[in-house]
Amino acid sequence: MHHLHSHTHLAAHPLTRVDARVKLLSAVALLTMVISSPGSAFPLLACVLSIALCLAIGTPLRTLALRFSEPLFIAVTVLLLKLFFSGNSPFFSFSIAGLELVAHRDGLMEGVRIASRIMGGVSLLAVVGFSTPFTDLMAALSWLRVPQVLIDVALFAWRYLFLLLEDAQVVYNAQKNRLGYVGYRRGLSSFGTLAGVLVIKAFDNSQSITTAMVQRGYDGVMPRSLQRPFRMAEVTGALLLVLGMGAVRLLWTVI
């Protein structure tokens, strides 16, 4: 279970001690501003501030880069699609293997706008994820009346995903010690065997876990975590942050 603590950051940072409900509501408000922003300046500002917060709470650069790699790829893809296949104002053109590609100025602006929204929204969620334990986040979602069945499924998936990861590491190390990944064909065959073993283990674990939970009185309803009262300082700080960012967004919209 050491994987559960592999992304533990600076517990002394004030952001990690803020109520998960306050952080979640603030993130939703800021996310709404980012998505509805008519320009790209505000989403980029939210992205920069969020990345700075992630670094401030002790998130390793490698972890941060891995977390942002997929949304960054999507943002770049959208930007390129908008640049070359959308718009009416030609910007520049070039040929590749006889294929003429024309970039459009208005398509570039639209692509930058969408890409900035993607990165701004992902960065806000990253701050909440890196600064909040998963169980506290699920408790906050339960307080927000998210369907309990979704929360239960997320908790089970989060808990037993690490067990499957440990099983995968054991099987992979055994295969590697037996030269199971020497060569492309042999490595592909070993990977298929690994995937099949994990599927079988997942079914076996689900049956044993279900039996154990029923024997311990599980009736389909997971007990909810008790929520502590809101702290006025945290609520006030969150309101000031949201209002301040809202004022900046409104100012840039007017300008």
Ranges and model annotations:
Residues 44, 60-69:
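Interfacial helix-loop-helix linkers and transmembrane-helix boundary segments
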Residues 1-40, 46-52, 164-255:
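Transmembrane alpha-helix interface motif
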Residues 49-59, 73-77:
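Alpha-helical transmembrane segments and their membrane-interface exit regions
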Residues 17, 36-37, 58, 131, ...:
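Helix-loop interface residues and adjacent transmembrane-helix termini in multi-pass membrane transporters
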Residues 40, 60-61, 147-149:
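Membrane-helix interface segments
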Residues 68-178:
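Juxtamembrane/interface alpha-helical elements of multi-pass membrane proteins
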